[in-house]
Every structure is written in C-alpha cells, then in structure tokens.
C-alpha cells in the first residue's frame, strides 16, 4: 500500500471567549468538514485512490492550538494544508508556519462575520514571512447558516488541492539529469536552487555513457527485456511509418531492428536509474539496484549522442 501525503484542514476562529468564539464553533467546523468531503470526493492520487484529508481536532484560535494542530498533522503524514474560516482571526497566531507545506486559505464570504479581512491579513502575513499561500474567496455572499461550497470556490479549492498533492509527492525525491545541457537550450539548464528551495527536491546527475555501460555489461533484467521487446514488436515496429531519408542515408532492416532493441534496453535502463530495480541486486549489481530515488528525469539529448546513437524519444514516450 502506497503512503501518500494527506491534506490537512485547519479551521481557524476568533479566539475571544465570552460569546464570540462560542457562536462560531459549529460554523467553522462545518466548513472544514465540507472542504474535506469536497477534496476526498474529487481529487485522487496517481493510483486512483481518493486523497485523504485530516481535520484538526478543534478550531484554532490561539498559537497553542496552532501548534497542537501542526503536531497532529506531522503524525498523520500531512503534506499540504488549507485554512478555513468564517470570521476574523488573529493571523500571526493562527497561520500555518510550516515552511514545507503548500498552503491555501479560504475566507468565507458571509453576511455577518465575513472572512475577507482575515484572508487579506493572513495572506499579507504569509507574504511578509516568505511562506506563500493561495487565497480563496467566493464571488457571492452567503448566509451564515449556509455551509455549502459555491462552484467558484470549489473550483479554486480543487485546483489548489491537485497541485498541492503533486508538490507534496515530489518533496524529498530527486530529479535525475542524464547528460548535460541539451542542444544549447538555456531552458534545459537544471536550476538546482529551484528544485531544492521551491520543490524540496534534490538533483542527481549521471553521464549518458552510463547507459552504454549497462548495455555492454548486461546490467538490465533480461526477462523483462524479452517481454518489452515482444510488446514493441507487436505494437510499435508495425507502425514505423514511411522512410523519408534519402536512399543513400536510409538504414537497412537489420540496422532498424538493432535500433529498436537499443531503445527498448535504453528505456529499461533509464527506469532502473530512476527508481532502482531489486532484480539487479539478485544479478550481483548491488549499487545499480539502488537507483536515484527520482520521480522525474530528463535525457538531455546532447548532439554528441543524438548525432551518433538513437535518441530518447521512445524512452520518453513510454516513461
């Protein structure tokens, strides 16, 4: 069973006792439950299972309650948070201060105690502290006893939730660069600061010759290769298309067959480089079996490779 990051729901409230907080408890928790239901029923993880939500044990009106909520979320494996409120709250005491969790704040557009002021104040606090948050506010005014989520608000919540889950799943994993700068394209220069500071990822790099080494030394699962080659013979080689090269530049049938074998092996090897492969350990290749913990990778397609050997188009399409 995969362990995916959950979304934490933070119901914040005006912490003043004596009638203020008490009058808002039920409303605020109802909004939190509605958000959790919305996300779990519409957003899924990559394997198709619903995204799990964790709601704070109670409303958050003071910093001690913020801390208790953060502790619970750490235990539960939360990877992103959305703060929900129907009223003014004390922003610096109730805001999510975790620097690694993607954040959103929904301020309820209500008739009596609108969340607009808190939304503006807490978003300013997030910006000042360098902890970006996505602000959500409804177009239409709702009655205080209306706990429904308007369509425009729901769309914003779901857009944020999908992005937040993706970012949370990337954190702690690697981007694997196979090769160096691609074809002189500045956009292919890997910005390690972006990956580390914005996505919480690390960067790994191997030379393109590692693919050739693994081919030459047979560092791939032969049984898996046979299955992959049979699939390719059936579904890909039969759709090669027309040969548009000049006759003197055209490859022979034997050369084309060799290219197909090459790109299939290349695909398996790139996958092994990214995620590792326990089968390689059984074959005696303990280091290669580990992989680079990569959730994404790029074959940089340097001319020194692509003018000489098959490029990575097939690998990229399959992966």
Write out the residue ranges for each language-model feature.
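An N-terminal assembly and electron-transfer interface module characteristic of large anaerobic redox
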Residues: 1-319
């Amino acid at each position: 069973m995969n362990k995916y990051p959950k979304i934490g729901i933070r119901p914040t409230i005006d912490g003043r006792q004596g009638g203020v907080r008490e009058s808002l408890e039920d409303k605020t928790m109802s909004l939190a439950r509605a958000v959790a239901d919305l996300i779990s029923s519409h957003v899924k993880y990559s394997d198709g299972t619903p995204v799990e939500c964790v709601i704070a044990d109670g409303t958050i009106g003071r910093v001690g309650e913020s801390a208790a909520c953060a502790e619970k979320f750490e235990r539960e494996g939360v990877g992103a948070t959305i703060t929900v409120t129907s009223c003014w709250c004390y922003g610096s005491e109730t805001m999510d201060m975790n620097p690694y969790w993607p954040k959103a704040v929904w301020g309820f557009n209500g008739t009596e105690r609108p969340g607009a002021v808190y939304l503006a104040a807490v978003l300013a606090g997030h910006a000042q502290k360098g902890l970006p948050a996505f602000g959500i506010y409804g177009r239409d005014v709702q009655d205080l006893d209306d706990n429904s989520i308007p369509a425009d608000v729901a769309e914003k919540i779901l857009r944020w939730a999908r992005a937040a889950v993706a970012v949370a799943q990337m954190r702690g994993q690697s981007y694997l660069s196979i090769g160096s700068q691609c074809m002189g394209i500045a956009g292919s220069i890997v910005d390690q600061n972006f990956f580390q500071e914005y996505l919480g990822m690390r960067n790994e790099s191997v030379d393109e010759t590692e693919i050739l080494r693994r081919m030459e030394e047979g560092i791939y699962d032969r049984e898996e290769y046979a299955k992959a080659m049979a699939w390719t013979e059936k579904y890909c080689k039969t759709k090669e298309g027309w040969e548009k090269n000049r006759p003197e530049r055209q490859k022979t049938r034997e050369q084309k067959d060799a290219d197909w074998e090459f790109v299939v092996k290349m695909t398996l090897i790139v996958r092994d480089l990214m995620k590792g492969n326990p089968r390689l350990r059984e074959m005696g290749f303990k280091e290669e079996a580990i992989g680079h913990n990569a959730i994404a990778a790029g074959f940089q397609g340097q001319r020194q490779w692509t003018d000489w050997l098959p490029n990575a188009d097939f690998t990229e399409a399959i992966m």
